[in-house]
A protein has these predicted regions:
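Extracellular glycan-recognition surfaces and repeat-rich motifs
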Residues: 33-65, 126-131
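Glycan-recognition/cleft segments
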Residues: 51-58, 112-150, 157
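Short surface loop/edge beta-strand patches of beta-sandwich-type extracellular domains
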Residues: 70-89, 156-160
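A carbohydrate-recognition surface predominantly in extracellular/luminal proteins
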Residues: 87-102, 331
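Beta-strand acidic-aromatic groove motif in beta-rich domains, primarily in extracellular
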Residues: 104-114, 182-185
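Short, aromatic/His-centered strand-loop micro-motif at the edge of beta-sheets
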Residues: 147-172
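Localized edge beta-strand/strand-to-loop motifs within extracellular or lumenal beta-rich domains
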Residues: 167-186
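Short, solvent-exposed beta-strand-to-loop segments that form ligand-recognition rims
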Residues: 188-309
Length: 386
């Protein structure tokens, strides 16, 4: 009932947004027929996706999604965009949900936006425009955002942390025509900035002048020996090793047979070691020298870094997972932030809290069923054996 009322409440909002927005792609995985829109790659032996809900789902229908089902496998699964599109002078807004129900240890959870694609040949070498979503392996817990530009896949110079629990989380990307971007986790902004600043789309605006030469009188030694520091006259009077003054000749020592007895040598506590002058700040120090900066002749601005160079024609998951069980759902691509927000909110409002409540109940139940200590467990085992 609550789920029905939620949908009835959000329906007018979705209709109002839809009047002024363009939805390029939407997938909710509500039933088996949704899988007809997706293609399993045959490029090699990939792991299979299956339609299912989570064991700690918040809604019987909303909780369904496509889940990775085989451990230690690569996955390649894609769907065609009904009408390929470009984002010229429009925002690109991508949203989807990820639920690492298996408590993932190493694996990807990101989605790709691709140009024209033969889904049966889809693999890790297939060209894509954007790769976006969580990536977890070992200590790595980050949100990936990679752009393809001029034949290169550009890595983000930021690494915001992704969610790493077993609950459902939404990820949203907004790319705007002014070459800015925003990344959201559960509709909370975790990063934003300028495309040119945060990826190596373009050469640097300035470079070091190759003709600039360090002056011969430039002083870049910050610390020097104190010229006023003088070695004491008695510094070297004491040797490094001396006979042990506490040593005595053993009573059984026979000089005719054993030779002349000599005291063993020990470190001299008065030995001062190598003398070094005191170090001081160089009064003539000018700082670290660096060539002056000049305008880079190879730099050319591009006010369309945000733009897909080829129409977006497909979406896909190209992943590796050691432990399977990740559920993907609620995929949407639009030119409207409001539409994506309304779509995700309608499907996730209250779901995460329900999942948390179910997780707490499960944990409490497991704690109640567990023996108080290992000794009780061992006693029970002994009684069974008797």
């Amino acid at each position: 009932i609550a789920s029905f009322l939620l949908r009835m409440w959000t329906f007018p909002l979705l209709c109002a947004v839809a009047l002024r927005a363009t939805t390029h792609f939407k997938e909710e995985f509500l039933d088996e027929s949704s899988l007809d829109r997706w293609t399993q790659s045959e490029a090699k032996e990939y792991g299979a996706f299956e339609l299912r809900k989570g064991t700690k789902h918040g809604d019987t229908v909303i909780g369904k999604g496509i889940a990775t089902s085989q451990d230690a496998h690569f996955y390649a699964y894609s769907s065609q965009v009904p009408t390929p599109f470009t984002n010229s002078n429009e925002k690109l807004v991508v949203g989807f949900t990820v639920k690492h129900e298996q408590d993932i240890d190493c694996g990807g959870g990101y989605i790709k936006l691709l140009p024209e694609l033969d889904g049966k040949k889809f693999d890790g070498d297939s060209e894509y425009w954007i790769m976006f979503g969580p990536d977890i392996c070992g200590s790595t817990r980050k949100i990936h955002l990679i752009f393809h530009y001029n034949g290169k896949n550009l890595l983000w110079n930021k690494e915001p942390r992704c969610a790493d629990d077993t609950l459902t989380h939404s990820y949203k990307l907004v790319v705007s025509p002014n070459n800015t971007y925003e990344v959201y986790l559960d509709n909370e902004k975790v990063e934003s900035g300028n495309l040119e600043d945060d990826w190596d789309f373009l050469p640097p605006k300035q470079i070091e002048d190759p003709d600039d030469v360090k002056p011969t009188d430039w002083v870049d030694e910050e610390i020097i020996d104190d010229p006023a520091s003088v070695k004491p006259a008695d510094w070297d009077d004491e040797p490094e090793k001396i006979p042990d003054p506490k040593a005595t000749q053993p009573a059984h020592w026979d000089e005719e047979e054993d030779g002349t007895w000599e005291k063993p040598m020990i470190s001299n506590p008065k030995f001062k070691g190598e003398w070094k002058p005191k170090r001081i700040t160089n009064p003539a120090y000018k700082g670290k020298w660096a060539p002056r900066k000049i305008a880079n002749p190879n730099y050319a601005p591009d006010d369309q870094l945000y733009l897909a160079r080829k129409p977006v024609a497909a979406v896909g998951f190209d992943l590796w997972q050691v432990k399977s069980g990740t559920i993907f759902d609620n995929i949407i691509i639009s030119d409207s932030v409001e539409e994506v927000d309304a779509f995700l909110e309608a499907r996730l409002l209250g779901v995460a809290q329900k999942e948390r409540d179910m997780l707490v109940e499960q944990t409490q139940s497991e704690n109640q069923d567990a023996p108080e200590d290992k000794y009780e467990d061992e006693e029970a085992k002994e009684e069974t054996e008797l």
